[in-house]
């Protein structure tokens, strides 16, 4: 049997893999998993529009904008990265058949709690654990607690 433990972007990969039906997965652990379409503020849309305008006027200046991950990519990879991180995996999450443990830090800003709740609602055979005093790197911030839940889940 195959068990998968993933975090953040790895959660995207795990959701796609688990929902594909191509590999039989016994148990899946999603920790601060990405993949649910984020709620975007008006300010976010303003920044995207500003970036698109600057990109047309000054591509050099636009290249200095964005997240650190984005800035380090080659021009060819930037569009691929944007497509991947903007793909909503909500429909895929509904197709996951395996037992799934979803762990999120209560203070996660990168993948907020509403995403965890949506995954839990969509994945029929899932359990949701929200850990206090932890953010996106819950597995580092509350290592012993995460280890306990993951161990109990995998050994059950």
Task: List PLM regions with ranges.
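Flexible "cap/lid" loop of the alpha/beta hydrolase fold
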Residues: 12-20, 25-56
């Amino acid at each position: 049997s195959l068990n998968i433990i993933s975090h953040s972007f790895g959660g995207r990969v795990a959701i796609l893999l688990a929902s594909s039906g191509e590999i039989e997965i016994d148990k899946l652990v999603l920790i601060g998993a990405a993949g649910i379409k984020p709620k975007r503020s008006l300010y976010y849309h303003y920044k995207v529009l500003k970036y698109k305008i600057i990109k047309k006027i000054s591509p050099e200046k636009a290249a200095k904008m964005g997240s650190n991950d984005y800035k380090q990519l080659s021009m060819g990879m930037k569009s691929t990265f944007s497509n991947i991180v903007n793909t909503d995996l909500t429909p895929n999450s509904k197709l996951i058949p395996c037992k799934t443990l979803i762990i999120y830090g209560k203070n996660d800003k990168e993948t907020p709690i509403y995403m965890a709740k949506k995954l839990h609602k969509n994945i029929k055979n899932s359990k949701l654990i929200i850990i206090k005093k932890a953010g996106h790197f819950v597995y580092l911030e509350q290592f012993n607690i995460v280890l306990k839940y993951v161990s109990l889940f995998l050994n059950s």
